[in-house]
């Protein structure tokens, strides 16, 4: 039990320190890291079930989907999470024809897209919350920390 309490306190200290020193940028980096690692774990679980998702490109597109709220404002306005998810479906549909057997094509596509919707698409909403800057500059940070605390406890 002491080990669990220690790890919880340590994780909260890391979160608070990152948010305090790096503000929203640090939070976005943490969220992206958690998103990619969670998606990796999801794909490993699917592989253990006997299916073959497109894990590498799925992780790359998953990181882009998580960062989509930032990409919309800094890179191009069409790089929304929805358009990246549609692009992922097209890329996987093209790759599936040449790389998978006809017997397991649907499963590969379904599990890969399910992972993208289940993990990074949902995490991008937390990035959106972090980017809220009104009525106070730290509104998004406070809301994100509150959301993490409520879901943790």
Please identify what each model-predicted range represents:
Residues 1-153:
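Membrane-embedded alpha-helical bundles of polytopic integral membrane proteins
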